[in-house]
Design a protein with these regions (language model features):
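Short beta-strand segments
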Residues: 23-57
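Short hydrophobic/aromatic beta-strand or adjacent loop that forms the aromatic wall/cage
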Residues: 25, 122-125
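A generic local structural motif
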Residues: 12-14, 40-41, 113
Length: 132
């Protein structure tokens, strides 16, 4: 992951945003909820209008990923999508929009369906809305 993040940043997304046969990736900056340390996670994303949608799957693990908890504590952050750095505010998708956003996410990466079958928790979707 560190190598992916470093290459993505160094090339302004030329390396790391898209790989042949794989879904597009963004870099999510987040601040540790307990530690306060800045972290970066490369994640698959889907688009929903101007918003970006990320999936807290952790490969179907029983617990949510650390970045999810970090965003709940510190929702104002930045993502890098290709060469663009975008300030965003994170929020958990509402029940009313979840099914529609889940289908968008699965269109980008079908493995999310299998991840959901591996775990008893409902995998959260996080909407990243651009801040103005």
């Amino acid at each position: 992951m560190k190598g992916h993040t470093a290459a993505y940043r160094a090339t302004r997304g030329v390396v790391g945003h898209r790989f042949p046969g794989l879904p597009q990736m963004l870099l999510l900056d987040h601040v540790g909820a307990k530690s306060g340390r800045r972290r970066t996670s490369p994640l698959v994303y889907a688009r929903d209008g101007h918003d970006l949608v990320i999936v807290a799957s952790k490969g179907g693990h029983p617990r949510n990923p650390a970045w999810f908890h970090n965003l709940r504590a510190n929702p104002d952050t930045t993502v890098q999508v290709g060469s663009k750095r975008i300030p965003v505010r994170a929020r958990v998708a509402t029940p009313a929009e979840r099914d529609r956003l889940w289908e968008k996410a699965v269109e980008v990466y079908g493995g999310y369906r299998e991840y959901q079958l591996r775990t008893e928790r409902e995998i959260p979707l996080v909407v990243l809305a651009p801040r103005r």
